[in-house]
Amino acid sequence: MGLRDWFVGLTAVVIVGGGAAACAARHSTHATIDVDAPVALADQPVHVRVSGLRAREDVTVASQAADAKGQLWRGEATFAADGDGVVDLDRSAPVSGTYGDADGMGLFWSMGPATGDPDEAWFSPGYPDAAGAFEVRLTVTVAGREIAARTLTRQWNATGVTHRTLTLDVDGVAGVLFLPSPGAVRRTGVLLLGGSEGGVGRKYDAALLASHGYPALALGYFGVPGLPETLRDIPLEYFVTAARLLRAQPGADPRGVVVNGYSRGSEAALLLAESYPDVVRGAILYAPNDTVWPGFPNGGNAWTIDGAPVPRTAIPVTHVAGPVLAIAGGKDRVWPSAAQAQRIMQRLDDAHVTAAHQALVYPDAGHGVGSFPYLAAGTSVTSPGTDVARSLGGTREADAAARSDGWPKVLAFLAA
């Protein structure tokens, strides 16, 4: 190589190197993540704002959390910073990402697992009777470089909330009882019933309700040792035992409880409001049914009362004495819960029930219309006892919007 060729090559290296340095200088090297509530209940929205960016700069904001099995979930959105170098997640719509429209909590509900279809996955952090909170890590990345990070804590249990596991041998029922801080104002207890999945579910809901001041019992009624293996021949009296136990707790209104039933649990909730109005003073029905269906998955009778099968007919409402709130999705593919919710309201009207009753129908949501918001959830489940995935209908975005709108209305219903 001659001197002239060597000089030309050196010049090219200098130019390329200088160009890379100039390119790096055009991007932000640090940013600030401002969060109004870095520690908050899991059902509470947080307001996230990223500042210190260059004007109009492309930036990716991501969320990451680990479920109870240690699997990582992630959401992300790419934005163009505004003229002041700010991205406000409440007001900024992503250019691309795991959600589409401006949504301050989009990074939370849109998270998906590292592998697999997010429509078939449900984010499940540690249960609140085992882990009182979980963490979400937010990061800001520009041109492939992480320039800011912050960890948020999402709590299930407010300060002072306690929980106790109930057993058949000791308490006559199986479940987990969550109680508000001692000395809290007496409020209506909430009895929480899951659907055909069985076991003791809805513990997240119970913990959050107790954190809002409502004694809450997540009750198992089949699929628990000592109880029926499947949803068949479940005595309504079992629920009454649980309701009486709940209303006797410190901080609970002794006049009665509200039963909150999801899917098949909504049948039991409405039957209890009709059959035991002295104990059940209201009902919240998620993705409800207005008719008694057979047992699941093997048929037979789902419910009994006084030892006799509850007839498989439309659920009567003539003795309902308390308020009823039904929440349904218009795209429910399990059953037509929106139409069924409306029929329940019509029957209450026809029966001249004077207590408040309302159906909230979210047209684009599915069977996953409830309950509390901001936890990543899929739109299909594997049916109990089978390996068959079943679509619940709706979309993740529509279900998330329904929960975000519906949960405050549930809390207002309980407070009324």
Briefly describe each language-model feature range.
Residues 281-316:
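Mobile cap/lid helix-loop segments that gate and shape the active-site cleft of serine hydrolases
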Residues 251-263:
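Alpha/beta-hydrolase fold nucleophile elbow
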Residues 185-195:
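Short beta-strand element of the alpha/beta-hydrolase
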Residues 320, 326-332:
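Short beta-strand/loop motif that positions the catalytic acidic residue
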Residues 201-220:
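Short amphipathic alpha-helix adjacent to the substrate-entry channel of hydrolases
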Residues 353-416:
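C-terminal catalytic histidine-bearing segment of alpha/beta-hydrolase fold enzymes
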Residues 229-250, 271, 408:
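Alpha/beta-hydrolase active-site loop
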Residues 36-41, 46, 52-58, 72-75, ...:
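N-terminal cap/lid segment of alpha/beta-hydrolase-fold proteins
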